[in-house]
């Protein structure tokens, strides 16, 4: 008899209690089990073999035997569910737990990790929020952008030093006289559904993208896209753009079927990258290695990310036979790898290419004066906020920020003189642990100085939409930025396409910012973008439009059998190259 059938019978006798010997007869046990005495003896024997109970029968009719139940029903269910999870029978495990998703999630975390079968590596992770649809043409948070990079390829990529590298296009060139960028595609490219990718595919896709508000500003200077032959795409611009290849190396320019752009609310997506999406629902995201990937096939076969809504889940991890828990913590994303009895361990830490900062909103009903902005900047200095976190015993693994990127020189500003603050100050941000805690800390400081503070937290997309349609009217806006792997182009886009930043600056300052960025785009090589953007960011800070606070520290800890685990810009482990020597 299967363990699941035995469980049903065990549930019937659990009423006698666990851990205490009782004297009973076979007939009495049979009555509890709703079966015959003969079948009852068989059931008791099978349960005893599994150590669920201890049965000491006495010979003779109506002799009272000894029965001891060894395990609580809840513990038994967990044990059986755990076995099913390890076998990949997730629906059965959930049924055993009576559809208790919280318990199911906790068991998932204890079993997540890597499994190696005949050299093939499968990864299972847990994450505490549901992923949005993995498509490039929607605004996404950091984790979704990481998965965009796994599911889609661009025409080209750009290294963190700004050097452009081939992807679906093997060569490219820029005609400075005619403002034309030409890309030459590899032959034999296909999407995950085996549909061919050629120049017409790219032209159709970019025609669709150009019509979307999400792309209109970045692609406004593209006047024509043509396909002279199936492996050649030509972009004609109306103004110079030396870094255009870097722009389209961004995750939002991942190559997808043009028809997918019009499809909404369908998680079954078709990409062109190293992994394909085989399942995506409210419970999990499952990726499978794509054998038709243009480059070397990834080393991992399957990656499953289970959604576990557990507020206690703070630290992500990755390992073999060990918990993998990935979540956005107060200090960004941390990845810890723990393997029992591991013979070696390692740790990598890096300061993110990004920043958590406050914006002073010019579109609020009563905009702050320069003196007030300067004074508040002093009041909410990150060192002061850090002291508040320490008093509250809140772990905040971050570096104090004096500019928007840690590689940029600190912006030194004079201390703000005391200024009368508004009676009411409103703070907005998006629903992210670090922003919520910063908002509460800032509220505490400003309340001490006589202001009544109200905090509103929007969804990530809602915050951007309110800025775009002009209805974001809170006094202070808390947000953050984090560069993708194409650092130079990503930094540019984080300024140029940032609805929230442009909205808070007001029309005059926004025009100034546009002029500076257009100048960068026209005359600066991609590899020099970060150098060119630094004085622009520093000016916004020195004029008290932006108040930098923290750079998050990203950490990857691991013990055990996995080889060459590295940390990506998004704070997630590089699942493409994880492998095991076992």
How would you name each of these model-derived features?
Residues 467-521:
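Acidic-aromatic pocket-rim loops
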Residues 66, 74, 217-260, 274-279, ...:
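Surface-exposed binding/hinge segments that line
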Residues 362-408, 537-545:
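Periplasmic-binding protein-like
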Residues 19-22, 41-43, 140, 171-215:
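Aromatic- and charge-enriched surface segment that lines or borders ligand/interaction sites
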Residues 19-27, 33-39, 51, 55-57, ...:
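Ligand/substrate-recognition segments at binding pockets and active sites
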Residues 145-174, 251-272, 362-367, 407-413, ...:
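Short, solvent-exposed loop/beta-turn-alpha elements that line the ligand-binding surface or hinge
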Residues 419-429, 523-558:
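Bilobed periplasmic-binding protein-like "clamshell/Venus-flytrap" ligand-binding domains
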Residues 236-252, 269-312, 339-354:
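Aromatic-rich, solvent-exposed beta-strand/loop patch
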